[in-house]
């Protein structure tokens, strides 16, 4: 089992001078809250107390070595590694099989993990491709009363609550990338740069978290149009660049490895990504496939829709996203458009029951023999119980959700009359805009 030990507190250059052997290597890290270097050593012996730990990071994975190198110090430390367990859990009669992988039991007692990765200590030793994460559909589109809105809480609150993938749609307007839903006349959430700056700031304040971003390239513009906002926002300091342009499901690094690298922002784009031009913007469909997009069917079939033509054998080698944002078809001026079905949110985002996230997750897990990697939702903070979408993800990950987020138990449609009236004017405006857009198309 791999063990990664991280020292907490300030690390002053020159204070640590461990003797290196041929089996060791030094890695330079970035970030104010993690050490400036780590030593990696392969051996069989694992330290069982803080007195046996050096102010360096060790990885113990080889079963052939007869000894190990650990210097003695009483400095405080954090163990960045998660336990591996396999279990089947039940969410209100919905059976969910988890992501954890069983490993051989160690002969010696293991230290207890004290530092969570993405909120859970168990995630640290798991592959990025072996974790289920909740994704905010159209994360920036927070506009009370606007028919095109998909979330109620801002991006910083989303991240604080536990959202670990941010999905959004972009449009190029006069040389600037904006966050707009279908049309910038319908809902304009500002520039991509401004949004990414908030994400970059959050990453700096949370050095043990990995965040994924999924860019919807609404205008199919060239990938280089996205480099300026990524660089100017400061997100460039955190973006992950893979060693090659195709990583199989089982080949993703562990969360602790990603965290130690300092590159904790995984950036994907649905169309026009080009590894040769911009290697840190990953082509979504090379790594991830999706279930039906903009679903209106409450059964939420777990079939491959994007990329089209992907065969089952290749799909099993990739991560996958379950689109669980229920939509409603409405007709305006003879045209049909899709809007979020807010009336059924407390059922759609529920732990169990027909049309629930729990039921969908169980169906997908049974069909593909593994849970979805990403659960895409509207209004993540609404469900049948507090943090219901996070409860479903936790059960899929074989961990216990103890968060205290969000979690209203009523749908938007059942709010007070006063609450609904507060957004009435903007709703009327958005409907007028939709009418104009439809008439323009016709």
Swiss-Prot record:
Pull one GO CC term from this UniProt entry: extracellular region
Which keywords does the record carry?
Glycoprotein, Secreted, Signal
Its name, as the record gives it, is Uncharacterized secreted protein ARB_08043
Q: Which PANTHER family match?
A: PLC-LIKE PHOSPHODIESTERASE, PTHR13593
Keyword Secreted carried by entry? yes
Protein localization: Secreted
A molecular function annotated in GO for this UniProt entry is: phosphoric diester hydrolase activity
**Annotated Low complexity bias:** 48-67
Which residue stretches belong to region Disordered? 36-67, 91-115
What organism is the protein native to? Answer: Arthroderma benhamiae (strain ATCC MYA-4681 / CBS 112371) (Trichophyton mentagrophytes)
- Renumbered to this chain, the signal peptide range is 1-23
